[in-house]
Amino acid sequence: MNTIYIIPIEPIDQRYTKQWYDNIPVVLEQQIAERNLDYHVVTIDGEDFKPDVRTEGAFLDFGATNVYKSTQTTAVSKLFSNGKVKAGDKFLITDAWNFIITPIKYMSDLLDIPVEIHSIWHAGAYDPSDILGYKMQPDWPNHVEKSWYHSSDYNYYATNFHKDMFLRNLNIPQGSYNKAIRSGQPHELIVDNLTQYQTTPKTNTVMWPHRYNDDKQPAIAEDLSNDFRMVITQKM
């Protein structure tokens, strides 16, 4: 039996990442059972480090996220070193901006253990409107992103717009476009949970559910709130 290792982004209660942490293993198990496949699903957690000072407004704490990712990397390295990772195993990286991709590919190649790397891209320095895009110094992050793209066997994007922007801004050669897949995102169970509210009486309200940070342009939402009822969830 082969293993699908899930390398999750931090499960944050206020964000969809907690729902992904809970739901992706369930969805995978369902699909494995329906297709009568022979896979075991394992989630590799990182250390839930709580720093004294946190990054304001950002999706992740820019210090603590490296503790989380590095402890994930340590765990995976031990699995490779102890012979637990087998040829044909798969790694699902639920946020591709994770340096763990490099050691997984390194160990797979040098230990002669061919595995597949599946990476979900959310944002990065390749997007000039993202916080990484306007805060990181050129040009190192783009070289890193290209490396992780090519290290991954499959790269997933929620929309064609996102996929095309990634390929264009990083100048990915057309011969490597086959690694880029417009997949949508695994929100099935979230949608299922919301169907119970379909018949609930509704009012004309706009919900703005994003992080209250410059890269999300909250000033636009604040300005529009003068014209109609706007609920900014981070200010509730």
Which residues fall in each region the model found?
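Short, well-ordered alpha-helix to beta-strand connector turns
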Residues: 87-89, 114, 151-154, 203, ...
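Membrane-proximal helix-turn-helix segments that form the acceptor-binding/catalytic region
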Residues: 134-155
